[in-house]
Every structure is written in C-alpha cells, then in structure tokens.
C-alpha cells in the first residue's frame, strides 16, 4: 500500500513539473491542458511567467462557461480558455482586427468565435459568464470614441455583456505610485487604483485581487517591452463581479 502511494505521489509530481507551476491549482484538467504536446512551443515557453493555471483558478472560471476575451492578440490565453471550458463552453474573441494566429485558432476550435465591433463594444450573442482581458486595459485608455476612452466603454459593455454574478478579470502592468494613467502610451503601464476606480464606477464590485504576478524587482520606470523587463513586469490581477 505504501509503495502504491509513493508511486502515485511521484507520478503526480512529474505531471505537475511537466505542466509548469501548478502549486496553487493542482486540478488535473489544467495540468493536462498545459502539458498538451500540441500547444505551440512559444506558448509553452511563456507559461512560467504567465502562470496560467493559477490565473484561471483565481478567475473562478468553470468548465462549460462562456467567456468574452477582449483583445486576445496571438491567442495564448484563447487556446487555454477554449480547452478549459470544453465543448459545452464558448470563447468569444473580441478583436476588430484578428491576428492570423487568432483566425487559425477560431478555424480549428469549434468553441471559439471571433466577434468584431467598434472599440469599446462586446458584441456577444447572449450574456456570458466572464469577460477576460490581460495586458490590454492601459491600451484601451489610448483609444477614444468621441470624448470617452475605450476603457470606459469596455467597462460599460462588460457590465452589459455579463450575466448577473459574472466575473470581469483584468491583468495589466503596474505603474509607479502616483502615475495614474499618465504613462499608458509611453511605458504601457497603469496604476491598479485607477482601474479599480473606473471599473467600480461602471457598477462592478471588487471581488478579489492577487499578487501572483507581482515582481518586486520591477521599479516601474521602464517600458514593458524593454530589454531586461519584458515578461518580468510587476502586474496586478483584479477580479470584479457584476452584482446579482
């Protein structure tokens, strides 16, 4: 019995090591998804920095859920979210100009659809369980429709798109204390206090925040793509909930 237990523990340890850092979320679906040899090597190389298993767990994403992913870029999270929610769930990739990689993902994953609208729109066909965006909110501040920036429009659209009790997850690069939203177009950072204030003003309540992607060595003075800091920026994670 003892030998069987030791063998089981060893197997689980190997699986966890293969899948990346899963200490916070030892669930087998996430481990299997991350360990999938079919994932692009470039995606697998980013797992250690992005900690997707822990992030998905913090987001409280459920199997079978519907998700609107804002500005998904090359689809790193799109692939993972699609695999995690499974065939009973759906990912709506909100992208006005989808990348070739995102177009390929939508073509090969039946539960992924690309939906396009004006900046600040989330044109989903039915209310969703979650709105998800990573490293984009600061860029939304740099685009306007009339006198209103796209961040405010997306916050309003997220509130409208979500089911009562739905989650709005935002991850972004932290700016220096006092910077507010003044460096969104230069350093591509924003202070989390600004995001909290703006999202709560759209009707959401803060449901949780995580230090999972904090990096104390980042002094917030460099642009996020500069050599030595790219992939190692100090990032905040905010989980908001639409009241029921």
Residue ranges and their predicted role:
Residues 47-66:
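Conserved alpha-helix/loop element of class I SAM-dependent methyltransferases that forms part
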Residues 109, 122-135:
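A short acidic, Gly/Pro-enriched loop at the edge of an enzyme's catalytic core
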Residues 180-207:
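Conserved Class I S-adenosyl-L-methionine
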Residues 82-83, 148-164:
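A short glycine-rich, Lys/Arg-flanked "PGG" loop and its adjoining helix->strand segment in the class I
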Residues 68-122:
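Class I SAM-dependent methyltransferase SAM/SAH-binding core
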């Amino acid at each position: 019995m003892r030998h069987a237990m030791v063998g089981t523990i060893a197997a689980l340890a190997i699986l966890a090591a293969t899948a990346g850092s899963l200490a916070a979320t030892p669930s087998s679906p996430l481990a299997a998804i991350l360990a999938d040899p079919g994932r692009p090597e470039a995606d697998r190389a980013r797992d250690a920095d992005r900690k997707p298993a822990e992030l998905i767990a913090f987001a409280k994403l459920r199997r079978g859920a519907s998700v609107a992913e804002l500005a998904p870029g090359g689809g790193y999270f799109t692939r993972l979210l699609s695999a995690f929610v499974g065939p009973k769930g759906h990912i709506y990739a909100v992208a006005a100009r989808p990348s070739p990689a995102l177009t390929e993902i939508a073509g090969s994953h039946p539960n992924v659809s690309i939906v396009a609208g004006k900046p600040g729109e989330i044109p989903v066909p039915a209310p969703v369980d979650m709105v998800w965006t990573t490293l984009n909110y600061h860029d939304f501040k740099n685009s306007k429709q009339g006198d209103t920036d796209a961040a405010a429009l997306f916050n309003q659209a997220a509130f409208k798109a979500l089911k009562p009790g739905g989650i709005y997850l935002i991850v972004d690069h932290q700016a220096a204390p006092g910077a507010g939203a003044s460096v969104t177009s230069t350093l591509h950072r924003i202070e989390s206090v600004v995001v909290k204030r703006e999202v709560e003003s759209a009707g959401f309540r803060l449901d949780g925040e995580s230090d999972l992607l904090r990096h104390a060595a980042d002094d917030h003075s460099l642009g996020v793509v500069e050599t030595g800091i790219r992939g190692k920026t100090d990032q905040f994670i905010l989980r908001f909930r639409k009241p029921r």
